Amino acid sequence: MRALTPAEVLFDGETPPALLPVCDHYAGSEKLMLKSLALQAQLGPVFDVTLDCEDGAAVGHEAEHAELVASLIGGEHDRHGRVGVRIHDFAHPHWRDDVRLILRAAKRAPAFVTVPKVRNVADAAEMCAFIEATRREFGIEKPVPTQLLIETHGALAEVFRLASLPTVEALSFGLMDFVSAHDGAIPDAAMRSPGQFDHPLVRRAKLEIAAACHAHGRVPSHNVSTEIHDMSVVAADAARARDEFGYTRMWSIHPAQIEPIVSAFAPRDDEIATASEILLAAQAAQWGPTRYRDTLHDRASYRYYWSVLRRARSTGRTVPEQAAPLFGDAAGAGPVRTQG
């Protein structure tokens, strides 16, 4: 009898929760876009690149900027198919043109479309529906995932409904706009660490977003760190986002931030080894209860350790060769450094 994999037995026939690269790096100008794509080609798909139409386009030149973005998606610099785009918000007159220009002209569909300044479910649903209709019109085979930016009172109030929209794969927190929306009631110290993790209203927002994502199998993506010189601050921000708030992805706005973010979200070597040993024993036991170092394990803990191995692969960490069958790989295939 063939050994069953974790994905086949641990989720009761449902699709395992979404897993995306743990870092989402933003670039708005052509120069920065090309530098970001070159870095992604070098490091591999351990981080996404988001080409920014919202903040990247000069006023009056939105179409030209969208055409630039389209020319890079699926082009020679897009080696891994992990390039997304942020379009303009619902109130901006050019958001539909962003979608049409990019989906029509890009050599392949973007990995995702990020929608900023979401105000309510109705607006988000309309934008998602337009993206879906446009990809069908242009003969794009698969749906284009959407990622919603939660940075308004209205979006936070409806965050669980937003997470349930069919094409949504991730929710991101927009810290700066969220703090600014309180008209001075939240001090500017909450726009950076440690205030961004300690102020009660900001903590509440982050926790609500993470809870909504996990309830619906979406990915919670943490806001940027404004620190661009001391990377230990960035690493600490990423660690707090992961450990205290349940985030599994984080934005980057400077190339130097990518490595500390990826490292912070990656499992440690000892965690990977433990997860491999527990899951291999479980697989040998046909996924019944097992005992590991005087601790009992069952399918609930197996799901946790499976998430460790999936994150290890998605962050480029080496998974022990003997654990390859857990992923359905041929034994002896060696470590795979792509998304799990």
Q: Could you describe each region identified by the protein language model?
A:
Residues 1-340:
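Expand to "…catalyze enediolate/carbanion chemistry for C-C bond making/breaking, isomerization
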